[in-house]
């Protein structure tokens, strides 16, 4: 019976769940590559080509009962390209959550995300469910380890004295010798899904796509990055006008599985909701800075993941129960019990 250990009292939620997921992440990758994981896209040192893997979830909404599925999927994605995988979220990681996470103000989900190694997320509208101040001061507190991105919030609001002082336009990760810039933005329709007070406090002063294009252009032209990933908390259709400075786009908000192409030719992926799906792509990067070229390749992880109607968006629901992962999860169960009893 899936994820039974997340039903129960606080100690079994906040601590037991995280212990189980941490174990799933640190168990050696013995299973990977033996039950269907696709070959690594490859590096070519002579040409300066390196591959960085992106694994995206969206609209998780505190569904910690699927946390082990996602932990396993992130681990298999990393084993596809060891040490060179970046997990990301396209927003609504928290908020609109089931009781087990909501009762603790989504701290179990934030602890879980830390166990996954998730350090980058777009801001979604549900991050503001308890108010903009609560988001900034608690959820976006640096101690939770996530860089929250919202380029279309006003610069004044993201200043040290602003209501979103812990939010930024973009962040950069250097992985496998390549610098990947991430820029995030929130739906232009915030006013239709949030209270007037939240809408005022968020202070979105630029169209989401315009903000993404502006920041991506700055990153590319500065030579500070070799590739740009956009995280847009809006339906995939909203990304159509993103320009050529963005190499891949992840979207969300509508809880759909979708694919598209931007005006600049970049692929767009939307990976469902509630931890059931994950979009996994390789960025195959040759060269550096303004001269870099980027090719995006969909990754079929195998290992119990399932296909969806969109190539590159995988089904991961129930993954922790797949035979290939049984040893990982049973190893985590004993440690989970020990941690729960200690609380």
Protein language model features and the residues they cover:
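Acidic, metal/ion-coordinating pockets
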Residues: 36-307
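Short, functionally important structural connectors and interaction interfaces within domains
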Residues: 12, 17-18, 270, 306, ...
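Intrinsic structural disorder/low-complexity segments
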Residues: 23-28, 129, 256, 310
């Amino acid at each position: 019976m899936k994820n039974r250990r997340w039903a129960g009292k606080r100690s079994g939620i906040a601590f037991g769940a995280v212990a189980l997921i941490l174990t799933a992440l640190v168990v050696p990758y013995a299973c990977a590559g033996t039950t269907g994981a696709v070959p690594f896209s490859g590096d070519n040192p002579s040409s300066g080509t390196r591959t960085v893997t992106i694994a995206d979830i969206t609209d998780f909404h505190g569904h910690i009962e699927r946390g082990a599925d996602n932990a396993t999927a992130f681990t298999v994605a990393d084993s596809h390209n060891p040490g060179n995988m970046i997990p990301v979220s396209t927003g609504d990681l928290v908020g609109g959550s089931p009781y087990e996470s909501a009762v603790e103000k989504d701290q179990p989900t934030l602890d879980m995300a830390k166990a996954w190694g998730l350090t980058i997320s777009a801001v979604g509208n549900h991050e503001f469910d308890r108010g903009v101040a609560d988001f900034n001061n608690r959820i976006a507190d640096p101690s939770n380890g996530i860089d929250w991105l919202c380029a279309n919030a006003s610069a004044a609001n993201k200043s040290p004295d602003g209501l979103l002082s812990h939010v930024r336009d973009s962040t950069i990760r250097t992985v496998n010798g390549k610098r990947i810039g991430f820029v995030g933005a929130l739906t232009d329709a915030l006013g239709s899904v949030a209270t007037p007070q939240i809408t005022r406090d968020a202070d979105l002063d630029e169209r989401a796509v315009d903000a993404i294009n502006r920041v991506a252009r700055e990153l590319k032209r500065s030579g500070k990055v070799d590739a740009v990933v956009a995280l847009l908390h809006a339906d995939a259709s909203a990304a159509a006008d993103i320009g050529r400075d963005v190499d891949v786009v992840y979207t969300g908000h509508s809880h759909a599985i979708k694919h598209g192409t931007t005006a600049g030719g970049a692929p767009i992926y939307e990976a469902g909701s509630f931890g059931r799906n994950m979009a996994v792509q390789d960025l195959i990067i040759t060269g550096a800075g303004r001269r870099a070229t980027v090719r995006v390749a969909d990754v079929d992880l195998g290992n119990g993941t399932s296909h969806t109607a969109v190539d590159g968006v995988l089904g991961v629901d129930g993954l922790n129960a797949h035979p290939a992962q049984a040893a990982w999860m049973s190893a985590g169960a004993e440690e989970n019990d020990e941690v729960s009893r200690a609380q």
